[in-house]
Amino acid sequence: MSLKLFRSTGFHSILTPGEARLALHPGWAVAAVAGWVGIACNAWLWQALVGMGSLLPAIAASIGIAGAVGFFLSVFGWRRTFKPAATFALLGSALLSGGVWTQTIPPTSLVDDATRISALLPAWASLFSWQVPILLVLLGGLPVLWLWNTQLRRLSGPAQLRSNLGGIFLWFFVASVGFALLGRLAAA
């Protein structure tokens, strides 16, 4: 008869070394969502690429929007709050993208004090056309499905706090650069 020092219960934790290495780091998840919102959900960038607008303000808006979303997600980058906050950011940016696309609003309206967020939303009538629902599904729904099916690496409390604080400072800097550039282009 042999002596067993450890008993196996058949239960495997998410914190096993192999699974922890395969899971996505929360910082990379923030970068992926911020990049998606800044590039794919930026209607101004796509309008500029097809020749309907200026490219430099669209790029500045991409940098500023990605930085703002990254900052927001770094603040809410904790284990229980990240996915709901990222869902809100993805669906909200898809809705705003539909409004910008259907109303052809210039990117400099982001730094205009007179512009309200409600002016960027799509009109109610456009919600029943084909463009806005398709944009909501492609730009918001599919990334939300990816997000909720992606395992994120569980970090210890101090490591998660360091990651969040580093992300807050980095993304604040990125947003400041993007919106400062957009403000200079709007003033010129």
Regions picked out by a protein language model, each given a short descriptive name:
Residues 2-187:
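Transmembrane and membrane-interface helices of multi-pass
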